């Protein structure tokens, strides 16, 4: 699937594929999608998690099929047909079984509403945002959270940090932008175990940018921010837009900035580099994130 125009040059835009499950409307960032296939019979896997329908092999590549209705506790009625949305993120190829694909919409992250606590119950929520399209509400699903719930081993490798043991405390302040409550907590816990205790956590790029502007006015930005870690997908302002703003600002551009996202692939890496990101890592690589923070902060403070 052609995604060349997506999130280009930090425009704060994305394309959302709208699909349905039991006549409810949901969305996924097109950047995650490899292709869409018609339903094919799958081979069940013994003792698999209930949401895993089975496996199939398009073009000799084995792919696990996940039933989104099961994941969202929706009724699974009648004969299963529909479509498979084949995705790639966190270095995984997966198929999500849906009823129907409605179309693709280009939208701004600023138009995506952050779900409140009634929709997203903290770390248990599976929605990253809600957007109004053609008079209806479309829920943007947190596919990383859905997959991690099914198979925790696909998430952050917290064991990478635990194996290193406790480290000496480091007071270097880090500014974070991450919209997922679960991932935000996991990343924060891992950084604290690695000695980084001075963390300023924000729910999206706009919150992080506003903090940077506040510190600039105070004249304290270089005392309060020694490194920035940002996700890409976030409501209101995405990580690419935040990166562009930081690296275009004469007072902020020398602050090390790391993009830490499930979307980092070859194409997205090129976009991040063009915007000036100092490093880009995929989300399972939490151990590598800590190593990169060590290197960039050490280099900046010399």
Task: Report residues per predicted region.
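Acidic, metal-coordinating helix/loop segments flanking the phosphotransfer/catalytic sites
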Residues: 201-227
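Alpha4 helix (beta4-alpha4-beta5 surface) of REC/receiver domains from two-component response regulators
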Residues: 241, 264-282
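Short amphipathic alpha-helix used as the core "switch/output" element in two-component signaling
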Residues: 240-253
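Conserved acidic segment of CheY-like receiver
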Residues: 23, 170-191, 228
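Acidic catalytic/metal-coordinating carboxylates
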Residues: 204, 238-241
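Receiver (REC) domain active-site loop signature in two-component systems and cognate sites
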Residues: 60, 234
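Flexible, small-/acidic-enriched active-site or ligand-binding loops
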Residues: 36-52, 101-132
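Active-site residues of response regulator receiver
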Residues: 231, 261
